[in-house]
Each structure stands twice: as structure tokens, then as C-alpha cells.
Amino acid sequence: MSSQEEIVIVDATNQILGRMSTHIAKLLKSGKKVYVVNAEKAIISGPRSRVLEGYSLLFTVKTMQNPYRQGIRRPRNPINIVKRTVRGMLPKNKLGKQIYRNLKAYIGIPKELEGKSMIRFDDADVSRLKGKYITVAELSRLLGGLKQ
């Protein structure tokens, strides 16, 4: 990588999480650093009950080695939900781990990123949806991640 890496700031407000994540994964694969701001305002399409059921499905699963101590770790806060979604779209090898380190997500807009130009993806806008949806912040509250 060059000494002057290109930084891309993505505003996740009213962006569909899956579609936004595909664009972020492509940017990361091209060697850019990506900062996602307003991660809690991203949108997941589908009725609230179905989305919650899908995310909470693996909370009760235990491992065979020590079922009392370990289970499958699932993200509960908005930052980790967004990062985990992008991680699933990256290569599953050493290169994928290195690429994943160039991704940062924030709740709100941090002071050092205020006033800088942010990009939004037109094909990931919530106006595409005709049905129901839930925000990542609302999902996080229902999973026990946000205390508001």
C-alpha cells in the first residue's frame, strides 16, 4: 500500500445494510480505508419480527466441547452488526483479515470526521423499499446491545 492511503467516509443514514455493505467491501478490496458514520441509522429490510428472529436465532446454540461455557458469538451493538455484515462479504483468508482492519464504524459522526465529504450509495437508499424495515439501532435495542 502507498504511504498516503485514500480514506472514504460513508454515511449509513437510511441506507440498506446489505447493499451498502457490498459497496463497502468493494472499496476495501480496492485498497481504501473506509469509515462508516451513523451506523445505527442503517436499515434492514423485512418485518421487525422476522429480522429479530433471524438475528437472535443463534443465541441459544451451544458448542459440543463445553456447552455450558461457550456459544456462538453474535453482534449486539450497531457498530459490530455493520462490521460483521461487511466481514461476511470479504475473502475468508489472510488477505481478508488484513482488508477488514481498514474498516471502522461509528455511532453518530465523530468530531475528527465532521465537515468532511461523505458518500452515499444511490442503489442502497431506503426509498427503494416498498415494505417494512427496521433500523440497526432498533434491532440492537431489541437484542440488548443499546440501552436507550
UniProtKB/Swiss-Prot annotation:
Belongs to the universal ribosomal protein uL13 family. CDD domains: Ribosomal_L13. Part of the 50S ribosomal subunit. This protein is one of the early assembly proteins of the 50S ribosomal subunit, although it is not seen to bind rRNA by itself. It is important during the early stages of 50S assembly. Keywords: Ribonucleoprotein, Ribosomal protein. GO terms for cellular component: cytosolic large ribosomal subunit. GO terms for biological process: negative regulation of translation; translation. InterPro entries: Ribosomal_uL13, Ribosomal_uL13_bac-type, Ribosomal_uL13_CS, Ribosomal_uL13_euk/arc, Ribosomal_uL13_sf. It holds the Pfam family Ribosomal_L13. The keyword rRNA-binding does not apply. One of its GO terms (molecular function) is structural constituent of ribosome. It comes from the Archaea. Gene3D superfamilies: Ribosomal protein L13. The gene is rpl13. It comes from Sulfolobus acidocaldarius (strain ATCC 33909 / DSM 639 / JCM 8929 / NBRC 15157 / NCIMB 11770). This is Large ribosomal subunit protein uL13.
